[in-house]
Design a protein with these regions (language model features):
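N-terminal amphipathic alpha-helix/helix-capping segment at the start of soluble metabolic enzymes
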Residues: 1-16, 107-130
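Structured beta-strand/loop patches that form or line metal/cofactor-binding pockets in enzymes
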Residues: 1-39
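A generic structural signal for short
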Residues: 11, 86-87, 137-139
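Residues at beta-strand starts and edge strands
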Residues: 19-21, 52, 130
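Metal- or metallocofactor-binding catalytic centers and their adjacent structured scaffolds
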Residues: 26-104
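A broadly conserved amphipathic alpha-helix scaffold signal in soluble, globular proteins
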Residues: 94-102, 114, 134, 151
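Metal-dependent enolase-superfamily TIM-barrel catalytic cores that perform enediolate-based chemistry
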Residues: 119, 125-156
């Protein structure tokens, strides 16, 4: 299986102006992995699809080699700056690569990620629970305002 194309899809909430970018990595076998970045779509698209971008860099590569490809993307982006939107673009592509690897190997992504970043057999055993973490947009001035924002967003 080889990477043939990386597609970006711009999404924007017209009410609050927040932008998202969906990234799809396509392969020669018809498989597609999906990732996402909370960054301006035009900039994410430029990092991925410009003549020196991530799409050309990864074309023909095996998408299941996620860690090697992450390092390749990171090394390649030194001239762009390895912060902000560039890292968001790399992260979106990486997520799509993990999705493809999970599909190719018939394993859940969380298991692949967990096992790839642990060093001993004991550490690699699945855990019954983990501490969740989430990043959210600015929450507002108080809890009531936050509840109202979340409730309004859920109704849309």
């Amino acid at each position: 299986m080889k990477i043939t194309k990386i597609e970006t899809i711009a999404l924007r909430d017209s009410k609050n102006g927040y932008g998202e970018t969906v990234v799809r990595v396509h392969t020669d076998e018809g498989a597609t992995g999906i990732g996402q970045a909370e960054s301006p779509s035009l900039v994410i698209d430029a990092v991925i699809r410009n003549s020196e971008g991530l799409e050309g860099l990864l074309a023909g590569e095996d998408p299941t080699q996620v860690q090697r490809l992450w390092q390749k993307m990171y090394n390649h982006t030194g001239l762009y700056g390895r912060r902000g939107v560039t890292i968001a673009a790399i992260g979106a592509v990486e997520t799509a690569l993990w999705d493809l690897a999970g599909k190719a190997l018939g394993k859940p992504v969380h298991e692949l990620v967990w096992r790839s970043f642990t060093t001993t057999k004991v550490e690699a055993e699945p855990r019954r629970s983990v501490t969740p973490y989430a990043t959210v947009y600015p929450s507002g001035e108080n809890i009531a305002q936050l509840k109202r924002r979340v409730s309004d967003a859920a109704r849309r």
